[in-house]
């Protein structure tokens, strides 16, 4: 019985950010994010979350972990019928946390990440994107583990 209780306690305990305690990080952009200027929109909300994380920012190689951003958007689709028919896009943001030694592939897939997704009529809303980045970053820091990409519902980021 004690083993069952202990197992339930361990399973119920959230994955803590303890493995990240005392670590340093660097934010990495893809070459296309950097070259296009898209990083100017992506980095500020991520940097704000990271500044409050307790991790130490590094300005160059040698950080313990690499934090990256992967964005995605579909081409949209009609949803609803009649007067309620609207064209919606699904946008998503994955915030990744990878060990410095992990080689992030070209498409940006991190060792660990949280993907926040949202259906919206306008895929270019900066406020929704900032909210998704913040949500995914906070969730990733809170639930960090060595590997896996996990979803989080992003509908709270939809502009009302």
Map each language-model feature to its residues.
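Surface-exposed short loop/turn segments
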Residues: 63-111, 118, 122
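C-terminal/domain-edge helix-coil "capping" segments
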Residues: 18-22, 101-160
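Extended hydrophobic/Leu-rich segments
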Residues: 27-29, 69, 133
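A structural "domain/chain start" motif
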Residues: 3, 7-54, 148-160
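Solvent-exposed, acidic/flexible segments
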Residues: 35-43, 86-88, 122-134
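Solvent-exposed loop and beta-edge segments used for protein-protein assembly and interaction
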Residues: 19-21, 61, 87
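Intrinsically disordered, low-complexity regions enriched in small/polar residues
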Residues: 5, 27, 40, 80, ...
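Short acidic low-complexity segments
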Residues: 53-66
């Amino acid at each position: 019985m004690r083993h069952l209780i202990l197992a339930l306690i361990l399973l119920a305990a959230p994955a803590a950010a303890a493995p990240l305690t005392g670590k340093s990080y660097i934010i990495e952009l893809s070459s296309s994010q950097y070259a296009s200027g898209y990083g100017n929109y992506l980095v500020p909300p991520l940097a704000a979350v990271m500044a409050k994380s307790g991790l130490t920012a590094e300005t160059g190689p040698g950080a313990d972990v690499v934090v990256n951003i992967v964005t995605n958007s579909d081409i949209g689709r009609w949803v609803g019928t009649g007067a309620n028919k609207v064209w919606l896009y699904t946008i998503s943001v994955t915030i990744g946390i990878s060990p410095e030694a992990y080689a992030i592939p070209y498409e940006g897939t991190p060792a660990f990440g949280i993907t926040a997704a949202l259906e919206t009529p306008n895929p270019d809303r900066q406020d929704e994107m900032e909210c998704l980045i913040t949500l995914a970053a906070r969730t990733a820091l809170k639930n960090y583990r060595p590997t896996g990409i996990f979803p989080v519902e992003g509908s709270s980021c939809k502009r009302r």
